[in-house]
Amino acid sequence: MRKAGTGPVPEAPSDSPSGLTHHGKVITPEPTQEEVADMAAAYGRAAGEARRLGFDAVELHGAHGYLIDQFFWAQMNHRTDRFGGPDLPARASFAAEAIRATRAAIGPDLPLIFRFSQWKQQDYSARLAHSPQELEAFLAVLSDAGVDVFHCSQRRFWEPEFPEIDGEHGLNLAGWTKKLTGKPTITVGSVGLASDFIGAFRGEASRTRPLSDLIARLDKGEFDMVAVGRALLQDPDWAAKVKAGRMDELRDYDAASLAVLN
C-alpha cells in the first residue's frame, strides 16, 4: 500500500478497490473490471517468477489493510461488479482470483500460504468476520481457490477470537481457522514479547514473555506453525535458543532493532 503522491513514482495513482481511502475520500478513479483482473493476474506472474527462482513456497499478503485486504473490507470496497458485493464471501472474489492465478503459475506441489487479519493498519478495531459462521464462509472461498496454509495475523496471539463462544481462554484466530477449514495454520502476534508492535513503532521497548502458553497451544494442536517478528529482529539466535530450551537467554526487545542497518 502506497500513499497517493509518494514515491517511487509520485504521479502514479495509488490503487484501491473503489478509489477511496477508508475515510471515503476519493483518491483515484475506481479501477475497471479489466484493471482489477490484471491486478489479480499480476500475483500469478510474480509467483511464477518466485518458483522459477527456486523459492520453496509462496505467501500472498491479504492482511493489514493492504490491497487484497481492502477488497475484503466493506469500508473500502463499494464495488457492485463481480469484485464487490454485500457480504464478505462476495468481496473475497478478488483474492480468490489472485489465488487461482498463483496456483496455476506455481503448480500443485508448491505450498501456497495466505495471510489475513481482522485488524487493519488504518483501523486496529476493524473486524471482517463477527462470528465463526462469517469466518467459515469467508475462508471457504479462499480455501476452495487453492490455499494450502492460512497465516492468521493478530496483534497478540494469546487473545481469543470469539470469547463470547469459548471464553477468555478460547481459540485464537489461527485456532478457529484450523477448526473451520481443516487446513494447517500459522499463528503470529507479539510472540515472545509482552506488548504488541504498535509500541515498537513508537520507539517503545518490550519485555520478554514466557512461551509456556504458546507451547501448550502448539502441543494440543490449536495451530501448526508460529511466525516470529520483533523477537527475532532483536535476537537472531531466538529460534535456536528456544529449541535448546535456553529460555533464560532470550533478550528483551529494544526498538533500536527496527533501525536501518548501516
Which residue ranges define each predicted feature?
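Flavin-dependent oxidoreductase catalytic cores
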Residues: 1-262
